[in-house]
Amino acid sequence: MRLTTKGRYAVTAMLDLALHAQNGPVSLADISERQGISLSYLEQLFAKLRRNSLVTSVRGPGGGYQLSRSMAAIQVAEVIDAVNESVDVTRCQGDRGCRSGEVCLTHYLWCDLSHQIHEFLSGISLADLVARSDVQDLVRLQDRRQGGGCPLPYAGKIEASAIE
């Protein structure tokens, strides 16, 4: 699979935004600190996310970013697509020139797998990820490391409607 750090970081940053947006806009500096992603890289990613209408920016004191739709309406595949990332597993990146301009024997197998991966990620929303207990555990750990920063309002599983 050719999913690089660009796609992984975009999904991580969007999940962080979804988890911390209940108190208003989230700054990229806060996401950078919590997730260990450079601020300049986040700025590049969020420019693409904004152009694709996944986030909106709020200027001024207390500004930052917000999801442009509910977290239940944003699919992981959309985030990956927005930053021009691919989940293509073919060697030829979907072109039919696998080898010397010809299709290789397994080309269609890898194309089918790429399609299945994209479909799988299209079926997972940010709300689905927020609701996962392993994500909740990691958020609590990150918040403790940050000195309590912005704890989530519920100790257990968070329903998407609690944050939206």
UniProtKB/Swiss-Prot annotation:
- Leader sequence range is none
Question: Which terms in the GO cellular component ontology are assigned?
Answer: cytosol
Any one GO MF term held by the record is: double-stranded DNA binding
Q: Which UniProt keywords apply?
A: DNA-binding
Q: Pfam families attached here?
A: Rrf2
Keyword DNA-binding belongs to the record: yes
| Gene3D superfamilies in alphabetical order | Winged helix-like DNA-binding domain superfamily/Winged helix DNA-binding domain
Using the record's annotation, list all stretches that form the HTH rrf2-type domain.
2-131
Q: Which InterPro entries match?
A: TF_HTH_IscR, TR_Rrf2-type_CS, Tscrpt_reg_Rrf2, WH-like_DNA-bd_sf, WH_DNA-bd_sf
Q: Which PANTHER family match?
A: HTH-TYPE TRANSCRIPTIONAL REGULATOR ISCR (PTHR33221:SF5), WINGED HELIX-TURN-HELIX TRANSCRIPTIONAL REGULATOR, RRF2 FAMILY (PTHR33221)
Name by which UniProt lists this protein? Putative HTH-type transcriptional regulator ORF2
What organism does the record attribute this protein to?
A: Azotobacter vinelandii
